[in-house]
Amino acid sequence: MDHAVATADEPRASPQRHLRWAEGVEAPAAGMRLFYPSGFSVSLDVPEAIAQFGHTADQITAILAAGEKKASKSPMAISKEHSAALYAYTEDSPLYRQLNYAMRTPSTPSNPTDNQLKLFADYIFHAERALNCMPTHVSSIAGPVFRGVNTLLNPAIYAPGKRITWQAFTSSTRKQAVTLTFLDKLPGRKLQGSVFIIQSSTAKDISFFSEYPHEEEVVFAPNSGFQVEKVLRTEGEKQSVLSDLAAYDMSDLDVYLLHQVA
């Protein structure tokens, strides 16, 4: 698989986009979570579902226009509404921040995220249906996908052999260099954070419908499960699998090899 060579001028992600790519990695041992209340049936269309996140009428109109434009040029069959649902997820807006927080955070009396999930259930439904229209990224054919986060994680949770679940929608990319946007860069061209190199079996390529198509985003559906195959320790090991990042010092970068199991 070809990758663009990384440079020191890689764009920086906004704090919000850092969150979209990083959320849900700190507590992956909680298992699967139900996102639809008992007896759920869809009651909101896509524009109404997006409005639950606080979008204005003008913002929703713009999202629908972008979705319609992308759907009209799409190489795969998809409705303009489902196209808009995907586009809304990739925007720099409160939607994904509120959504992923509610999906990954246990509900407590002081923080009743289950109440938020009831508000967001229609959007989750539409987004999952939209993902089903997307091409599947099968790593045995198309190569691994990559996820970079500017966080160092508990090594006990991500130890080799561990099974983990990422409950929320999870973003990754086909391009190694895109992970630089979501890592911390320290003096001396040193990278800090964590990179996951993932063998995918069901993730969906949404890059055509993204606000940032250059990121070549591939999304894992909620409750995707993985096994930690290996943690790379040496600079040589890291450079061998992250050749596009070889110009950087990766001594403070944790690199995990994951295999999707669910």
Predicted regions and their residues:
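Active-site and NAD+-binding cores of ADP-ribose-processing enzymes
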Residues: 150, 162-163, 173-180, 186-262
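Internal glycine-rich, Lys/Arg-flanked active-site/core loops of soluble domains
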Residues: 41-209
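Generic detector of low-complexity/intrinsically disordered segments
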Residues: 3, 21, 34-36, 46, ...
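Intrinsically disordered, low-complexity, charge-biased terminal/linker regions in eukaryotic proteins
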Residues: 1-68
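Short low-polarity hydrophobic stretches
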Residues: 1-5, 146, 175, 228
